[in-house]
Amino acid sequence: MHFGVNLSFTVKRWVEPEIWAKLVQEQLGLSLVQFTYDLLDPWWPESLRNTMASRVRKAAQTWGIEIESAFSGLANYCFDGLLHPEAEGRRASLEWWKRAFDVAAAVGASASGGPLGGMSVADSQDPKRRQQRYNDLLDAVAELTESAKAAGLQRIQVECTPLAREIPYTVSQSQQFLKDLEGRCAIPVKLLVDIGHALYQPLYGPNARMPEWLNGLGRSIGAFHLQNTDFQSDSHWGWPDSRGLFDVARFADEVKKAGLEDVPAFLEIIYPFELADEVVLKSITTSVMHCRREYAGETTQEMQLA
C-alpha cells in the first residue's frame, strides 16, 4: 500500500519547503507527498515560480521525499475553472493549468490535476448549454494533455467531486468522460477518488459504498484522497475525531480486493486557518499514524523506526 500526505495541512503555516519537508520526514515519518498549488501559485511571475519550485525540489531531495503529483488546492477550487460560463473565464483557467503543469514538472512531480471546474446554475439547468460546457471541457482536457506532456508530466489526474454541476461526479459519468476522451489525449487521464466525495450521502444516498467506485473505475483510478467524514459533508477531518465515521482499515481491505494496492493514497485534511498551529501539528501527526497503521498496515515497531 502506498500512503502519503497532501500538503494541504501546511498552507498558511509551514510554507517554507525546507520546513515542511523536514516535518513530513521527521514528524510524520513519510516519504511520499502530494504538492498543492496553495503553496506556489501558478499565476506568480515566472522568476518567482522558478525560484520557489527549485527550493521545493531541493528540499524534497534533501529529505528523501517523493513528490508524486501536484494538486490544485483550495484557492483554485473557488473558481468555475474550465466550466466557467464565459469563454474568457474558461481560457483563463486553461492558462492557469498550463502554468500549473510547468510548476509540477519543476518541483519534480510526474502528474498534476484536481477538480476541473463547476457550471453555473443557469448553464447546468439549460440542456443545450450544459452539453456545450461538456464538449468544451473535453476539448480543454485534450489540449491540456498536450501541454502536460510538453512540460514533462506523465499523466493528468481529474478529481471526482460530489456536485452535480461539476464533471465528473458519478461512476457512470466518469466512465463516459474517459470514453469520450479516448484517442484525443497525448498522455493518460486518470481519476482521483476522494472517499469523502464518493460516500457523500446527501447526493449518493445512504447505501453509498466504496466498492462501487473501486470496481466501476478500476485501473482508471490514479490516486485516492483519505479523510475522516460523517458522510454528510465533505468533512476532511482527521483522527481521532468523535464526529468521523470512516473506517480506514475496511477501505484498505476494499482496495486490496479491487487489486488497487499500488494506487497511491494521500491523507488530505483541511484545517480552519484560525486553528492553533500546535493543534494542527498534533492532529496531522495522530491522523498520519492512524492511517499508517490502519491503511498501510504498519506495525508499531515499523512506525517507530521510520
Please identify what each model-predicted range represents.
Residues 1-7, 11-29, 54, 108, ...:
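Histidine-acidic metal/acid-base catalytic patches
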Residues 3, 66-68, 85:
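Mobile, glycine- and charge-enriched loop segments
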Residues 9-11, 37-39, 73-76, 116-120, ...:
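Active-site-proximal loop/turn and secondary-structure-junction residues that shape catalytic pockets
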Residues 31-42:
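A short beta-strand-loop structural module common to alpha/beta enzyme folds
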Residues 34-35, 67-72, 109-116, 153-159, ...:
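Short beta-strand segments at enzyme active-site cores
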Residues 41-50, 74-94, 118-132, 235-240, ...:
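Surface-exposed, active-site-proximal loop segments in enzymatic domains
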Residues 44-64:
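Aromatic-lined substrate-binding rim segments of carbohydrate-active enzymes
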Residues 62, 80-190:
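Active-site acidic/histidine proton-transfer and metal-coordination neighborhood
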